[in-house]
Amino acid sequence: MRRAAALVSSAAGRGAELGSRGLIFEPTLPLEALVRGVHHLSIGSAGSTTLVLQTVLAPMLFGAGGSLAVTGGTHNKAAPPFPFLEQVFLPRLCEMGATVSATLPRAGFYPAGGGELAVEVEGRAALRPLQLMERPEGARARGVVLSANLPPGVAHREQRRSRLS
């Protein structure tokens, strides 16, 4: 993640190696001096593309923005899956004044990975506070059952059980 943040913010750093006991991250330019970029990152495993995006989103939003494509896992344990990013997280950011869009060219599941997440970010964002004090009228809870390389019965069973809860 340090390498991803360094890429989008023209930063230098060290200590991201396996077994490191410390981390140094030094931006080399102020945010206003960053130029819009087209970035490609490969996690090289099923590591979470959405966690990488959440790491680099702030420097991209407040800097010059740009596009980012990340390959790795898009649907992982202990990480927000792409649908959460697309349907919950990014819409709230946009309500605050950000201009961010995301697409899922290819899904990648743990343990294989191989997915791709792509985002476009307009930089120089001036975000407003977001106050969520009441549940919006018409709001409802919903769920999506998504599976890969499993018999269809597994997804159907999960769907049936979630309706009973």
Q: Positions of the model-derived regions?
A:
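Short, structured secondary-structure boundary patches
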Residues: 1-8, 120-126
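Phosphate/diphosphate-binding glycine-rich loops and adjacent basic-rich segments that engage nucleotide
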Residues: 25-26, 31-37, 42-46, 62, ...
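A generic, well-ordered mixed alpha/beta core segment in the N-terminal half of proteins
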Residues: 2-101
